Amino acid sequence: MSDVVSWNLQLSVQDGRLDDVHALIAEMVEATRQESGCLGYEWFLSADGSVCHISERYADSGATMVHLGNFGEKFAERFMSCFTPTGFHVYGNPSDDVRGVLDGLGASYLGPVGGFVR
C-alpha cells in the first residue's frame, strides 16, 4: 500500500472574516508550495463564502509532520480565528505521530482498501 496521507477538512467561515480568509489562503498556499513532500493542496469556497473545504495530500507521514509543524508555527492561531472545523476525514495510514497531532483536531480515519492515482 501507498505511504500517502491525505485529508479533506470541512470548515465554516467565521462571520466577517472572509477578507482575512482570502489573505490567509494566499499565504498558506505559497508556504505549502515550498514543502517538497506536499503532493496536492487545494482550497474551495462556497459561492457565499460561508463554507470552505481543504484537500491536502502528502507523500508520507514525514512530509505530513513537516507541514503540520509549519502550520503550527506560522498559521494555526490565525486559521482557528477564521474557521470552525465541521468535518475532518483523513485517508491512508498515518503514523502514530501524525495521528497524535490530527486527533486533537477531531480527525476521523479511513484506511485504504483499493484504487489508484495516476
Residue ranges of model-derived segments:
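Short, flexible turn/loop "capping" segments at secondary-structure junctions
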Residues: 1-5, 45-49, 80-82
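Short, surface-exposed ligand-recognition loops at beta-strand->loop->(often short) alpha-helix junctions
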Residues: 12-22
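Hydrophobic alpha-helical membrane-association signature
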Residues: 24-25, 71
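Conserved beta3 strand of the protein kinase N-lobe
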Residues: 41-43
